[in-house]
Structures are given as structure tokens and as C-alpha cells.
């Protein structure tokens, strides 16, 4: 069972990619060093980047963010003023005629996240734009 307060952990999860990891593969220095040196590690292989730090943050499990957002909505413990619109709603637009197979082909995971952000922006009075549609 997950805690209803797991949203802050999701927000701080990408911070792990911002800090260097201690490199412990080198032997201890005879002069008195600890043998640990700060360097940026490649998360996939565990080796330092030869050119320095990566220029982009990495989200380790982007699908887990969507699943957790759906669980928070399903639990009914969303705070006042913070509600996500998961899935398409019938508002009379031309996009409601898409079949489920076509929607997955066109949207995918990133398309679904973009729709959620656009829906939240529209509710708050922000502008909206469409990717490659009309």
C-alpha cells in the first residue's frame, strides 16, 4: 500500500541525477588519500563520462510517474486545486473520434503526458497548442 504523500518523492526523484556519485573503483592513495574521487557516473554502465557531466537530466522510470499519478487520482486524496485530467474527455472536439489503437499509435506515453499538461494548463487559463493537428 502506498502512502498518499508519495508525490514529493516523485518531485525529488530527478534530483538524484543532478549530484555526482562517488567513484570507488580506484585504489587507496599511499599519500593519505581516501581513494574516492568525485566524478559523474554513467547510470547505465557505472563508468564516468569521459567528457564531463551529462547535459540532460534523466528520469529513470517515466512510466512509473504516469502510474503513480493515476493511483493518486484513483485514491481520491487529491488536494483541493490540484486535480489531473487523465484520459480524453468528450468536449466536442475532433480528437474524440480516434479509435483506441490509433490513439496509442499517435500518442503513446509522451503524448499522454503532454495531453495531461495541456489539460491542466487550459483549466488554469493558460494557452494551448496541438502537435501536428489542424
Swiss-Prot record:
| Pfam families tied to this protein | RFamide_26RFa
* Prosequence residues removed at maturation: 19-88
Q: Name one GO cellular component term.
A: extracellular region
Residues making up the signal peptide according to the UniProt record? 1-18
This protein's assembly is summarised as:
Ligand for the G-protein coupled receptor QRFPR/GPR103.
Q: Which family, according to UniProt?
A: Belongs to the RFamide neuropeptide family.
The protein in question is named Orexigenic neuropeptide QRFP
Tell me the organism: Bos taurus (Bovine)
